[in-house]
Amino acid sequence: MSTVTISDTPFVGNDRLLVGIVLSVLTFWLFAQSVINVVPAMKSSLDISLETLTLAVSLSALFSGCFVVASGGLADKFGRMRMTTLGLGLSIVGSAMLVVAQGPGLFLAGRVLQGLSAACIMPATLALIKTWYEGRARQRAVSFWVIGSWGGSGLCSFVGGAIATGLGWRWIFVFSIAVALLALFLLRGTPESRSASASQHKLDVGGLLSLIVALVLVNLFISKGHGWGWSSPLSLTMLAGALAAGTIFIRNGMRKGEAALIDFALFRNRAYGAAVLSNFLLNGAIGTMMIASIWLQQGHHLTPLESGMMTLGYLVTVLAMIRVGEKLLQRYGARLPMMAGPVLTAIAIALISCTFLEKALYIGVVFASNVLFGLGLGCYATPSTDTAVANAPENKIGVASGIYKMG
């Protein structure tokens, strides 16, 4: 066995641990992500330009994506509980910064810490599930983990809009701090676990730096390219730099093998590779819901609460279908739900793109498309996540989970 557990007595995952894990995941997906729906409210009370505020909103996802694989490797090396605890601590500090922020400095720093928090929490908690749950118990635990991530992302617009409308947007992060503290309490007493073989390898600093450079340059190209001009020298420089850094990252990974930040041998498992690729594509598809929320506020003058209510259909269906997806997985295997989910999601994207429709009709179409999103993603989520976890080697479960969640 290549996973070391640090405990005097055998430990089996229980509901207390599972609730703590789900609450940990919610600190990012429910609270940190809710800023997407309250940008206008934050703009009115902060001394920050809209461009800077938009950058701040994307920073948490950017830093989470940059560091989630490295954090998964550190969880394998130093301990999954240790990284989960670190992530919750970063979430508390980052949320506190946002509560007191008046200008760009603290606000940007808080969003960065929230991203780093998510990078620590997501792979470490999936690794804890792989370590402490087996068989159907693992599939059930994965379902609830998925409810925390996919369900939290569906609820964040409504919760964020409701809190911002009723109490003010800063209270979103007060509640986030309270949830993080409760998660820390529930996770107390969980034995540590880590990979014996991972401790023999040093962190691949070169791979980490090249990955960060590639992701940052791609983000700048996508977010700033329109303003700079897609064919301007600056935009083309960003794109060329991203391609060069990506090439260096891949060559470094191929050369270092198991010692690389991402061991490309993981993708030899077709089931794991399919789960990672499809998860990447569907996570990108969720962006259409976020764009629709902003368009409903700025184009059709809905309030944050009203635009948040448009996602209730998604929330109900995704939460219902996540457990259905678990049952489909147990009865038919992962292939059927993992194929049906993207088809439903594609139909939802086509509907939500019909911005040329008259206001009342478009609002109805958006609500219906969100329902389809929930059906598709809920059907897909548990089979996909369980496939990634089940097919990851014990000594690389943190890294493998990080790669999966980087999407």
Where are these regions (language model features)?
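Helix-loop-helix hairpins in multi-pass membrane proteins, especially solute transporters
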Residues: 73-206, 233, 394
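Interfacial helix-cap and linker-helix signal at transmembrane-aqueous boundaries
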Residues: 42-43, 74-75, 159-167, 222, ...
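Cytosolic juxtamembrane N-terminal segment immediately preceding the first transmembrane helix
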Residues: 1-30, 44
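Extracellular/periplasmic helix-loop-helix junction of adjacent transmembrane segments
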Residues: 38-67, 106, 300, 305-310
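12-transmembrane solute porter fold
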Residues: 16-31, 35-37, 206, 233-238, ...
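Hydrophobic transmembrane-helix bundles of small-molecule transporters
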Residues: 165-279, 285, 310
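Central cavity-lining transmembrane alpha-helices of secondary-active solute carriers
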Residues: 58-72, 122-126, 312-325
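Helix-breaking motifs and short loop linkers at transmembrane-helix boundaries and internal kinks
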Residues: 45-47, 79, 100-106, 167-168, ...
